[in-house]
Amino acid sequence: MAGINKVIIVGNLGNDPEMRTMPNGEAVANISVATSESWTDKNTGERREVTEWHRIVFYRRQAEVAGQYLRKGSQVYVEGRLKTRKWQDQNGQDRYTTEIQGDVLQMLGGRNQAGDVATHQNQAGWNAPASTQNNYNQGASNYNPNQTQAYSAPQTNRTKPAAESVMDNFDDDIPF
């Protein structure tokens, strides 16, 4: 039986993307994304929070998009897989790093956060569903020939989605 190696992260960038170019000319972007959990301690009633930092690497076109549009504080949705790579430090010692290799990058938040991304997206010829989120999938992984989708120009006046208002009132207590 084949295993599953899938990671889904929703969080905020801790720094601007670190951009590099590989010897073959392909772009590489490294980002650091914070995810937080908060809860109320049942014994003390004290509010607790734990933040985890995740190293994520994107290659090729996704790296270019990340470098162009993401900034410190940007909220992102990332799908990818865990990868461990081996490298040598300055002393020649073998080191290992486990990171997420990003396959899907979706910018969350509002248009004010990342600029006029949807307009740039349409001018570049990418297929952009009309929504408040901008999807930067690599390849055609979400293509379904039997499904029809309507595409439209970006809207300038967008209202806050109902799902966000539900989450604003969400009780963070752990149910067990």
Curated annotation (Swiss-Prot):
Q: InterPro entries attached here?
A: NA-bd_OB-fold, Primosome_PriB/ssb, ssDNA-bd
What residue spans carry the region label Disordered? 126-176
| GO BP term (any one) | DNA recombination
UniProt keywords, alphabetically: DNA damage, DNA recombination, DNA repair, DNA replication, DNA-binding
Q: Does the keyword DNA repair apply?
A: yes
Q: Which segment of this protein is annotated as the motif Important for interaction with partner proteins?
A: 171-176
Report whether DNA repair shows up as a keyword of the record.
yes
Under the heading SUPFAM superfamilies, the entry gives: Nucleic acid-binding proteins
Looking up PROSITE patterns in the UniProt record yields: SSB (PS50935)
**What's the superkingdom here?**
Bacteria
For this record, the Gene Ontology CC terms, alphabetical, are: nucleoid
SSB domain location, by residue?
4-109
A Pfam family found in this protein is SSB
The GO molecular function terms of this record are:
single-stranded DNA binding
Task: Specify residue ranges for compositional bias: Polar residues.
Answer: 126-159
Q: How does it assemble?
A: Homotetramer.
Its biological purpose is as follows: Plays an important role in DNA replication, recombination and repair. Binds to ssDNA and to an array of partner proteins to recruit them to their sites of action during DNA metabolism.
Report what the protein is called: Single-stranded DNA-binding protein
Q: What organism is this sequence from?
A: Haemophilus ducreyi (strain 35000HP / ATCC 700724)
